[in-house]
């Protein structure tokens, strides 16, 4: 048996071969979970109403303090719209609190207060793009459901974050106006503002984490009586059922939230490299790799996606033998292909719901920096005949957060 056949059989045996992720079936399941979530009948997709219309609201020249609490970084800026064009100024980026170790809600509020202190003289409006699950209120506050992406902030679940922030800032800004929006919804709004709104729109985040938001008819949001047309935050990373392989289960067991966000753990930048590492460990124990490669893998405690991108692009990764290179590159490419198939299935479900061309604003490092993944996804979109026009908004999350605060 030749080496490529051995690798294919191995990947099939441990459940990571791309052929095991059927785009048609997963798309059908995804659409069914969307319906369940919109009806309020439970299911793996929360389908959270945002109460924000899909068309950017009329905006004035009033500046807005825009915050972006992402999976890796926390950004803050002052955003002002002039003749409908967003201008982003005073942009600062720091590491997202709670990634290096657990912090308290009080610590997080103090951090935000410190970040925006100098900007309160410019604006009393704050728009927060929050990349974690929360229930929106009609007043555009957000009650936190849970965190993900390995971020830990104790005491935050169940809290109305805007109300808590107003309390923390009462002495500095008693007249504060606050709006909270999810990252995918902010990306959708930011894309519409920066690139133009021409039809059904969606926002896709595929970076440290995974999520998607899209415009939905009010009549379809059955769990919300008398709803108007609005953006729905899918919380797509929680989708299930999925064809989990052995490496997925091993990775899930060592995360901070085992059993949660299965799709995110199969696709996003925080986890894909770790799935590759688990697969390579299994390949080593199965005798597919040389002793030199086995030693290298055994010494690695983690493998970020930027490292798997690097290994895919060099001639002799790890052990250096031709067989090692074939095993390692085939496993990485196959896991990327599988991830792209899963995202394509999600997009197919949303496209079928839209019924016409979908204008998709994409944000996140996996799409823009992992060229192998991007090429695989764009190829699959074309092969499946999906009518998608994808676009990039330079500061979509900040722009979208500002628009939410002006709504």
Predicted features, each with a name:
Residues 93-110, 134-202, 223-239, 374-375:
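Glycine-rich phosphate-binding loop and adjoining helix at the ATP-binding site
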Residues 74, 133-137, 210-213, 241, ...:
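Short, acidic Gly/Pro/Ser/Thr-rich loop/turn segments
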Residues 86, 150-154, 189-275:
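Glycine-rich phosphate-binding loop of actin/hexokinase-like ATP-binding domains
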């Amino acid at each position: 048996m030749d080496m490529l056949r051995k690798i294919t059989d191995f990947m099939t045996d441990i459940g990571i071969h791309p052929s095991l992720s059927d785009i048609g079936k997963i798309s059908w399941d995804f659409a069914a979970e969307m319906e369940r979530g919109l009806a309020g009948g439970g299911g793996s997709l929360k389908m959270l109403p945002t109460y924000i219309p899909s068309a950017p609201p009329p905006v004035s020249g009033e500046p807005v303090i825009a915050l972006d609490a992402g999976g890796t970084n926390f950004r803050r800026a002052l955003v002002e719209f002039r003749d409908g064009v967003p201008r982003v100024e005073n942009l600062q980026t720091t590491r997202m609190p709670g990634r290096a170790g657990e912090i308290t809600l009080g610590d997080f509020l103090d951090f935000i207060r410190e970040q925006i202190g100098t900007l309160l003289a410019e604006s009393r409006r704050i728009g927060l793009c929050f990349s974690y699950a929360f229930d929106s209120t009609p007043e555009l506050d957000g009650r936190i459901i849970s965190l993900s992406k390995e971020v830990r902030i104790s005491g935050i679940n169940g809290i109305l974050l805007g109300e808590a922030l107003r309390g923390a800032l009462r002495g500095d800004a008693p007249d504060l106006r606050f709006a909270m929006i999810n990252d995918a919804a902010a990306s959708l709004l930011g894309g519409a503002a920066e690139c133009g709104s021409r039809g059904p729109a969606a926002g896709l985040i595929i970076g440290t984490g995974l999520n998607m938001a899209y415009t939905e008819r009010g009549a379809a949001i059955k769990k919300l009586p008398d709803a108007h047309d609005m953006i729905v935050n899918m919380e797509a990373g929680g989708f299930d059922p999925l064809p989990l392989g052995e490496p997925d289960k091993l990775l899930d067991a060592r995360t901070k939230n085992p059993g949660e966000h299965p799709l995110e753990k199969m696709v996003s930048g925080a986890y894909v490299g770790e799935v590759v590492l688990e697969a390579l460990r299994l390949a080593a124990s199965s005798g597919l790799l040389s002793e030199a490669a086995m030693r290298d893998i055994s010494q690695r405690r983690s493998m970020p996606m930027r490292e798997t991108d690097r290994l895919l692009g060099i001639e002799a990764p790890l052990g250096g033998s031709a067989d090692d290179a074939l095993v390692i590159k085939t496993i990485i490419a196959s896991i990327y292909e599988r991830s792209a198939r899963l995202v394509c299935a999600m997009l197919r479900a949303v496209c079928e719901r839209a019924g016409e061309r979908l204008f998709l604003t994409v944000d996140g490092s996996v799409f823009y920096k992992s060229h192998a993944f991007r090429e695989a996804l764009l190829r699959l979109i074309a092969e499946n005949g999906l009518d998608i026009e994808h676009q990039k908004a330079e500061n979509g999350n900040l722009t979208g957060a500002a628009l939410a605060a002006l709504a």
